[in-house]
Amino acid sequence: MAQLWGGRFTKETDKLVYNFNASISFDQKFYEQDIRGSMAHVEMLAKQGILTAEEKDKIMEGLGSIMEDVKEGRLAITSEYEDIHSFVEANLIQRVGDAGKKLHTGRSRNDQVALDMKLYVRDEIDAIDGEVKNLLKALLKIMESNVQTWMPGFTHLQKAQPVTLAHHIGAYFEMFRRDRGRLTDIRKRMNTCPLGAGALAGTTYPLDRAYTAQLLGFDEPTRNSMDSVSDRDYVIELLSALSTIMMHLSRFSEEIIMWNSNEYQFVEIDDAYSTGSSIMPQKKNPDIAELVRGKTGRVYGALMSILTTMKGIPLAYNKDMQEDKELTFDAIDTVKGCLALFTGMVSTMEFKKDNMEASAKNGFTNATDAADYLVNHGVPFRDAHGIVGQLVLKCIELGTSLDHLPLAEYQAISPVFQEDIYQAVSMKTCVEKRTTYGAPGPEVMRQVIQENIKYLEEN
């Protein structure tokens, strides 16, 4: 059992205790971050005269070889080590001798693991941001091709007003764009370096914390050593942002599942992103969308777990905080996987435009436009609302729609209606006259698409 402590103990650690306490099975995931942090620490120690140039070169060469050997599969990370820190240090000493024993000068595992976690989270934020950007590109492509693809817009899952597919997909574009903004905010706020905080009270060595922070790409060192080793706000913020991403993916998945059903027939998911049934030969199931929807709860669970873990911990570091790793690793991997699969699925879906348009023409989605027609002819809106309600009842009675209701029936309810009512309630007119910024009208929709293109080019 390789561990970095034990001098004051008179008994061996119980095997069950060792296994319960060890974290090597999961914190090996950030071996690269651990070695990068150690390299920066060594550079700083040499700069400050705490290590000689020869010691620095030996240690740097040893750390580099460990990184390369693990990456290439020549060196296995095994359970004989308590954690990734002891694995790296033990292997370093084996390779470079006594110089390796100086690696931990001016450092505690408390600030070391805080650094590793920050480096890992920062790297993964960049990776997740890239996956969200890929999804936005796929959505933008759909928007560009469907500025005049009419479909019903819904409220309460009831047909409400006609919109376009570009406009509907654009709503999700906005959601995922905000998600990128949240990731950017988290990255900026967390970008302070905890290395040099020690166990909780700093160190007596003349460390240059600003130099270490600069080497590792941080904006500055953290400002309080106790907070440095006990801060997991950035983990909580990340899991919150990931939960929001999953919520957006889940909402979109729910719509795709409905749209893919025989009852809607708005889309057909590509065979490559569908599965079948072991008993029903006709089935083509939207399993990817369903799994994305299901995995949302998994990410929510990680957020609630870390909030619960942190709520009762006194300052500064406590072993409870080891529980943040597996939760965070799993949530990150889940979100990255869901984003990649979802992007592939939406990129290959076939939109059944004729069915969408036919659906928009049913369900009185143009009723509001009939009311607006009356308002434009001097009828107060509240009166117009009541008149169109009567028209809808008449259409239901006759089994027809506002597009095909005879003019005599219109005029029997209100003499204001004239022949031009049919143009006013056509799908084309209903959508095209909605020209306020953010509405589905083709002209303003094209403007938004150009803004989205510019956003993706610049971000």
Describe the residue ranges of each PLM region.
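Glycine-rich cofactor/substrate-binding loops
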Residues: 2-37, 98-99, 280-459
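Short, contiguous, pocket-lining structural segments
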Residues: 127, 131, 157, 161-171, ...
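Conserved helix-loop functional segments at active or binding sites
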Residues: 145, 182-185, 189, 218-222, ...
